[in-house]
Amino acid sequence: MEQQTSVRVALRLRPLVKKETDLNDTHTLEPHNPPDAPPQVLVNTDKRTYAYDYVFGPQDTNAKLYESAVAPLVRHCFNGYNATVFAYGQTGAGKTYTMGSGAASTEPGATEPGIIPRAVDHLFELLESLDADSEQYALHVSYLEIHNEEVRDLLHPAASSAKTNITIREDAAGDIFVHGVREVAVGSREALLACLEAGCDARTTASTLMNEYSSRSHSLCTIRVQRNSPETASTVFSKLRLVDHAGSARAKTTGTAGQSPTDTATHHQARH
């Protein structure tokens, strides 16, 4: 692989929202990109800097973030490597917007699609470039959420009203897998995006003091790629996992509507 480490961290600074500009708030952190040094952020209060693999400022688009930090992972997944993109941050930080795991981001014509719909387009571009006479491919997608320590299948037809028998297990080789989840075979980007849109609509959301439509669950979208080569009688499997972690903040800060402090505590325990 091009990158030398298995885990890389990107920091994204979102723009100020109207409530913050009305209060004359300013950014505490600023991007700092010195020559011949890793990208950094500058903490204005104490002038300290912290280095990351990628730093994106408030003006940077989803397109720039995707091309810099995510596109290489999708190419590696196409070549047989497993890859995960994990969005983590406080409620209202812009995780769902960045990941594109909100319903609006998966709809056709979305003005600023997030990582998930961009990854779908990119993956199909790569797969469609294969020589159909020498190699075939198959894609399957699953979409889960974890809410209050319950795992829900967002692609289950009755996911919003019925509990599904889903368990997380470990096989003999030490690999973690999810038993009982529905995997949908998809043959086109439109079919895959339709699955994701249905899953987004089923996600658990709630209004908070920090975000009117906050995702109150952790979501995990898994795209399983299978490439078959009849010439060499070989098959390559890989998985692209796209995780939108629900907001990380105290109940007093978020003021989550319809949730008790116990609900919020359980929500945080589900990360582990």
Each language-model region and where it sits:
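P-loop NTPase "switch/coupling" elements that transmit nucleotide state to mechanical/effector output
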Residues: M1-Q90, G100-H272
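Conserved lysine of the Walker
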Residues: K95
